[in-house]
Every structure is written in C-alpha cells, then in structure tokens.
Amino acid sequence: MCKRIVGLDPIVFEDSRILIVGSMPSAISLKEQMYYANKNNRFWKILKEIFQTEDKIELLKVSHIALWDICHSCIRKTSADSEIKDIEPNDIQGLLDRYKNIEKVICNGRTSQNTMQKYFPNIETVYCPSTSSANAQFSLEQ
C-alpha cells in the first residue's frame, strides 16, 4: 500500500519574478529536502550554465526565480509523475497574491502544466519540457 507523501515548502524571495512549478519532488529530493536533487535531473545544470554560479539558493535569488510544486501532497508509489494519485494541491494562487512581483509562472513538465490547469485554470502558465532525466526526448543542449 502506498502512503501519502508531502512535498517541500516553496523557495521564494520578495523580489522573485518567475515561479517555476514542478509536479512533486522525487524521493531523492524529499530525502535531501531540496528541489531537483536527483543528480540526473537537468534543472540545476541548466541554471548554472546560464547564471554561472554553483550555490543553488544564491542562483535562484540572483535570477529572481521561485520554486514550488503543484502537489502539496499525493499518493505515489515511485518518483514517476505517472504514479501521482489523489492530489492535494498547493495554494499557488495564495503564493502569487503574497508575492506580487511574480509575473510569470512556468510549468516544468506536462504533469505540472495539466495539474495547474485543473486546479488553477485562471492562472496563465508557460509550458517548459520537464528537466527530469525521464524526459529523454530532449538533451541538455536542447
């Protein structure tokens, strides 16, 4: 039997302008208590290439990026998005109301985008292909 898992708190700053919304942290990310902690996930590699800094929190701060996931909690057997069931969403609208500088919401992956559209149809989002290594159709260079 699968048990309910709870995601991470948002990483957000007063001057964040972009919110990147994932689906639910992987088991590795939950264990490490850091978004995109799986070494095979390309998220941090992409941002480090653009912003030329190694410190993850500093990288988010200087790039005015906030991170959160659409799922506050869910039932999931493995880290695969296809396994996500019984979603309790995070209060994305509440976060946007609190942090007025956020002007763009980017969904990291199709599950994130579809779930955002289901629970928050009035929030405009931009789709970005998943940075997960499970999304093998795109290379890091692409």
Q: What residue spans do the PLM features occupy?
A:
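A polyanion-binding, active-site-adjacent surface
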Residues: C2-K104, R110-N114, Y119, V126-P129, ...
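Short, charged, surface-exposed secondary-structure boundary motifs
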Residues: A134-E141
